[in-house]
Amino acid sequence: MAMRAKDALGRFGEEVASRHLAAGGAAILDRNWRCREGELDLVLRDGADLVFCEVKTRSGTRFGSAAEAVVGRKAARIRRLAARWLAEHPHAPSSVRFDVVLVSRPPVGPVRVEHLRGAF
C-alpha cells in the first residue's frame, strides 16, 4: 500500500527531528510509541531530563504554524500518554520535559528545524 503524502511528510519530519536531537546529545529511547490512547513521536533522555517530544512537520503555512498545533487538547493528550509511558517504563527521571520540534519543509529552500524546549 502506498504511503499517503501527509504520512510521508510526517515520517520525514520525525527522522529530521531525531537526527537533530541526537546531534545535540540526546539519546532516543523510543520512537512512535503506541498504546490504545495514541502515539508519542519521540521519547528521549537529554542529560538528566526525560523528554516527551511532539514533532510537527509542515510544507507550508496553509494550516498554521506547527507550534499552533500543539495546544489545549493535544498537549493534554500528550501528557496522558507520557504518564502511560512512565507507568510501563519506570525510569524515575529527575525531571520530565515536554518539547516540540518544528520541521519546515518549504517547496523551495532548505529544511528548517526549530526545537521548543519545555513547550508545554
From Swiss-Prot:
Family: Belongs to the UPF0102 family.
Coiled-coil portions: none
Protein name: UPF0102 protein FRAAL5785
Pfam families associated with the record: UPF0102
Species of the source: Frankia alni (strain DSM 45986 / CECT 9034 / ACN14a)
InterPro entries per record: Restrct_endonuc-II-like (IPR011335), tRNA_endonuc-like_dom_sf (IPR011856), UPF0102_YraN-like (IPR003509)
Origin organism lineage: Bacteria, Bacillati, Actinomycetota, Actinomycetes, Frankiales
UniProt-listed CDD domains: PoNe_Nuclease (cd20736)
Gene Ontology molecular functions: nucleic acid binding
